[in-house]
C-alpha cells in the first residue's frame, strides 16, 4: 500500500502544493488527500486519474512527475 501516496507526497512537497489546494481543485475532502499522502489508504484508479487532472490544473509539471513517480514505483513492484 502507498505507491500513489508516496508519489503524491513527493510531488506536493516538491511543487509546494498544499493538500487543501489539491482537495479544492479535485472537489474532495482534504481528509481524503491526507489519507493518501500518509499512506493510510490508496486512491482507487479513478482517483489517480483525478489527482493527475487536478495537478495538471495547478502545475502541469507536477502532474507529469506524479504519473512518472507512480508508474516507476509500480514497475519496480512488478519486477520483484
Give a label for each model feature.
Residues 61-80:
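Short, charged recognition helix plus adjacent turn
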Residues 29-31, 47, 70-76:
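Conserved N-terminal glycine/acidic-rich loop preference
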Residues 27-43:
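Recognition helix of helix-turn-helix/homeodomain-like DNA-binding domains
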Residues 26, 37, 67-71:
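A general structural motif at alpha-helix termini
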Residues 40-53:
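Short, basic-rich loop-to-helix N-cap that marks the start of a DNA-contacting helix
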Residues 1-15, 21, 25, 52:
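A short, Lys/Arg-rich alpha-helix, primarily the initiator
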Amino acid at each position: 500500500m502507498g505507491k500513489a501516496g508516496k508519489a503524491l507526497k513527493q510531488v506536493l512537497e516538491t511543487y509546494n502544493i498544499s493538500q487543501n489546494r489539491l482537495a479544492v481543485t479535485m472537489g474532495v475532502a482534504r481528509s481524503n488527500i491526507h489519507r493518501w499522502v500518509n499512506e493510510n489508504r490508496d486512491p482507487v484508479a479513478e482517483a489517480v486519474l483525478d489527482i493527475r487532472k487536478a495537478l495538471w490544473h495547478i502545475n502541469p509539471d507536477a502532474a507529469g512527475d506524479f504519473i512518472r513517480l507512480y508508474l516507476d514505483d509500480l514497475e519496480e513492484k512488478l519486477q520483484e
